[in-house]
Amino acid sequence: MTAKHNQYVMALDLGTTGNRAILFDYEGNIVGQAYKELTQFYPKAGWVEHDALEIWRDTKTVMQEVVQKTAIQPQQIVAIGLTVQRETCLLWDKTTGQPLHPAIVWQDRRTAHFCGELTAAGYVDEIYERTGLVLDAYFSGTKLHWLLDWVKQSKSVDPANLLAGTIDSWALWNLTGGKVHRTDHSNASRTMVLNLDSLIWDEKLLDLFTIPAQIMPEVQPSLSYFGVTDPEILGVEIPITAIFGDQQAALYAHGCDRPGLLKCTYGTGAFLVANTGQTVTRSQHRLLSTVAWTQTNRDKSLTRDYALEGSMFTAGSCVQWLRDKLGLIESAAASESLARSVDSNGGVYFVPALSGLGAPHWDMNACGAFLGLTAGVTKAHLVRSVLEAIAFQAREVVEAINQDSPAPIQQLKVDGGACNNDFLMQCQADVLGIPVERPAVLDATAQGAAFGAGLKIGWNQLQIRFFRTFHHGTISLICLQFLPMRIQEGVSVDQ
């Protein structure tokens, strides 16, 4: 046994609904984890906020809890990888470390009117050309504009003392004791102010959104050295060697390292991301062009991987809505058995627009709806129609990716809590007409962050783990493969 077998990498997965710390060993196995649920705040219709101090407190707590649970010594943790919910952003005071306003969450729609004004002023094409993003309230740029407007109205705030950032920047700043204000290319590419070609903050867009360049974090490669943790957290300094947006981390974990490979994470929303290689692919179907990840080579050159993404704002949250607001199910897991209890949706169809519609429609004003209601409809039909809507929503995006990308999608790799639902996964395979592969490890976001951090410090064994677990055509460690019904019946996909 080598010294590396007594070493561990910690993944910090700071998501929309909760924050986790997971420890991985040298073989890529999970040896322990801790989790804290995150409070959601809805101060007005269409507004969604998080308490940034709660995010940091919980991050620190889960780091300490996972060490205590596993009895691993902090000095055995040789690297940390960080992955976060994207687009969510905030401002904070760099002297006191206090947030100036609750973090505005990616689902928040308060800037939809401002987006409409920019659309009317003719900025849609220019923003897409510079950033690869659709002009929408989803992204950080308009949120930061709103926050800065709010700051101007507060006489108690010193504008010269501001720092801005997405959740990775906020977490990194706190992890390093306020010493490091940086972000990585994957998170920066979701702000709507990063130039997708030059990979630096775009001065024209900063001016458009009235964001001072000096308050923005420094941008660096996803796999690189981001500093060390404050020893007050775990008693030792631990290097932070990888940062990803959550969906890019999942893509990395699935080994989707070349064009034609696609993953879908079913969480609060559903996010389909396809690697498009080292050049930007521009979509003709309103998909997002984004940075997958970046890393520096030994000769100091930068390797960049780009992706096409279809973001769907509601997926697992639709099931939560059935549970929490309508009371149709007692748990998310109960949706599967209830959907199977009927042979069809009974003619009921659901429009999954509880937070507007994302790709490929990008309709900020769309609302959800049940269609086809009759006296014979039961709650089972309603639940089944919601699960089917998630699958058909994903099909729209896959069809758009196939039209935009020269490499056709042959299979879908999945992760996230909602993909535990076998009915949903089988429905997904049926409507796509391609196999759906669900790995044994569903924590792909955390796994991607940990693997990236480990590989950066020379844990080459993890590269072998990539190919054993996720390599195209390999299912040795796949928990379950869902085949379309027509393949099960002996009909090829091409037919």
UniProtKB/Swiss-Prot annotation:
Query: What GO terms describe the biological role, i.e. biological process, of this protein?
Result: glycerol catabolic process; glycerol metabolic process; glycerol-3-phosphate metabolic process
Give any Pfam family that matches.
FGGY_C
Q: What class of enzyme is it?
A: transferase
Look up the domain of life of the source.
Answer: Bacteria
For the ligand (ATP), the binding residues are T16, T17, T268, G316, Q320, G417
Q: Which Gene3D superfamilies match?
A: 3.30.420.40
Name the positions where ADP binds.
Answer: T16, R20, T268, G316, G417, N421
Q: In the UniProt record, which is one GO cellular component term?
A: cytosol
Query: Catalytic activity annotated for this protein?
Result: glycerol + ATP = sn-glycerol 3-phosphate + ADP + H(+)
Enzyme Commission number, as recorded: 2.7.1.30
What HAMAP family has UniProt attached to this entry? Glycerol_kin
The name under which this protein is listed is Glycerol kinase
Which organism encodes this protein?
Synechocystis sp. (strain ATCC 27184 / PCC 6803 / Kazusa)
